[in-house]
Amino acid sequence: MAEPQPYEKLMSMADLLTPAAIRATATLCLADHIKAGATTSEALAERAGTQPDVTDSLLRHLADIGILTADDEGRHYSLTPIGEPLLSDHPFSLRQVLRNDSMIGRGTQSLLRLDHTVRTGEPTHGGGYWESVNNDPAYAEEWGEQARAFDAVADQPLSWGAQYIVTEYDWSRARSVVDVGGHLGAILLALLRHHPHLRGTLVDLKNVAEQAGARFARSEVADRAEAVVGSFFDPLPKGADVYLLSAILADWRDDDAVRILGRCRDAAGPEGRILLADVAMPTNGPATELQFRSMMPAPSRSAEELEALCTEAGLKVTWRGRTGLRTLLELAPR
């Protein structure tokens, strides 16, 4: 076989069909349907609500690339080991990551406009991305699925160094904490479980706050946890001892980060404290650098850069904890 010409290699490298086919399969839940017995294009189309002829083309392409295998007649399909992580119940399931309609999947689509990020330094999705994800009812079901999946695993470990928030900060001085932008409440739940004297309030936008509240209600700390709908660009609940900002600022430009810190400063007052626990996303070369920058403005701020933002927001550092993957800084109004 002749060696491919350079232009052929380039077109192969730039091809979007196979990534799109895999993500369509994840979005349409086709792997789950195949496992449940819908193994022909007709049966899959009926189960998934898709067009039989296009579904057949998709299945044949998935077989060509090794995601599926077909029987001798080319009618019945089954998953290969490569395709099995597309199952929702696979131990290493990638379906949520690869779905076009998931938060992660939608964020990944920003790579299609990488030229915008290279030209401007800004992510393709700005604050409007988060507003859409957190307010669009279509995402409420996703948040609910994630919350129930987390609850189904006993002793769900915290990731990205978040465990140091629970174990390295001196929580004995606090009685109340507000988790600002606390997502589904994993960190707040861990805090309340490890420090039974604490009471916690989670603040986030509508979809995620409602799911976090339902998750708290199902937990053993229901009497000490609440979730309220709100934005960290608006006034926050006042009077708590500690305001936690975990993995928030990387998603925002410097001026927005200063605004967020300022809202925490105003709510904390002269006696309160802010615990900044920002993540510096690890990069393994230019590929991950480009991926992170296409989705967030500042994925890897150093501790010094974070401290400069805090100073601009009228805050001083009163304690320095771990740095690296997770930078921990306790802050107080200047």
Give the residues covered by each predicted segment.
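Conserved Class I S-adenosyl-L-methionine-dependent methyltransferase catalytic core
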Residues: 10-25, 32-33, 47, 53-175
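Alpha-helical subdomain
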Residues: 1-64, 69, 82, 171, ...
